[in-house]
Curated annotation (Swiss-Prot):
Record carries keyword RNA-binding: yes
Gene3D superfamilies: 3.30.70.1730
GO cellular component: ribonucleoprotein complex; ribosome
Oligomeric form and interacting partners: Part of the ribosomal stalk of the 50S ribosomal subunit. The N-terminus interacts with L11 and the large rRNA to form the base of the stalk. The C-terminus forms an elongated spine to which L12 dimers bind in a sequential fashion forming a multimeric L10(L12)X complex.
Superkingdom of origin organism: Bacteria
Family: Belongs to the universal ribosomal protein uL10 family.
CDD domains, per the entry: Ribosomal_L10 (cd05797)
Name of this protein: Large ribosomal subunit protein uL10
Family matches, as NCBIfam families: PRK00099.1-1
GO biological process: translation
SUPFAM superfamilies: Ribosomal protein L10-like
Pfam families: Ribosomal_L10
Amino acid sequence: MAKPDKVDAVTEIAERFNTSTAAVVTEYRGLSMAKLVQLRRALGEGTTYRVAKNTLVKRAAEQSGVEGLDELFVGPTAIAFIEGEPVDAAKALKEFAKDNKALVIKGGYMDGRPISVSEVESIADLDSREVTLGKLAGAMKAKMNQAAALFAAPATKAARLAAALQEKREGGESDAS
């Protein structure tokens, strides 16, 4: 790779580190090109999966202020740069690694700090943002309905009591006639 190409590659990787919400470092030793294409499709539009030379990635990480990942850049390295919610991409990587033993998740970077393999897997086990928001909305609606029923209960009881008293009075008046 010529020097200008290396400079461009470092700049591009540094830019990806800066714009991504998370990055997952993987080893892809033994994956065919067809499998890499399949993985890229599984990751979706919000994630860029890039194979890169370790020295260039180290320089790019240093340039963008990313620290603590140097030990991950050993062997054939590819990085999934995730823009947006990291849950779906982490799920896709975990599933793909389960089906293809040649893909090894080494760790990653999120919220300004390195994350371990177990943290990446924990993120993959989370519900997506949409599912979590749906659960929250459902719980809030149930609590609102419960609160409305509690507030309406005294008024309903008072109305029933008034109706019972009125029936009793009307019943008492007809007996007196």
